[in-house]
Amino acid sequence: TYFAELDFQIKHDDHYDSTDEIMEEKDQHFITFAPANADIVVLRAANDIVRTDGQKLGLKSEWKINSTQTTGKMNVKLIHTPTSVNQNYPSATNQLGQTQGGETDVDITVDVH
């Protein structure tokens, strides 16, 4: 089991940490996780930031790896101004979190070993 905490750094003219802004504007953001070809279960951490609608933002999570031979990918998206969110949405691809509407601010895929 691994505990993950996301930190959003923006680099352009100056280095800028946007994590605080995301926390302050928690109701305007939501994070989804989608493992691919990896036997991983992602849970939103008990100490994660909670939006006013009762949904956890996703900045803090717990990753349970079910196989020692797990090699795959994890896709993480930060959605800005979604019209609705569901933190408990599981799908056939083991995605955690679902949104309707909004814009994708961040869309990254990382290797999982």
Where are these regions (language model features)?
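First exposed extracellular module after export/assembly in secreted or surface-exposed proteins
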Residues: 1-113
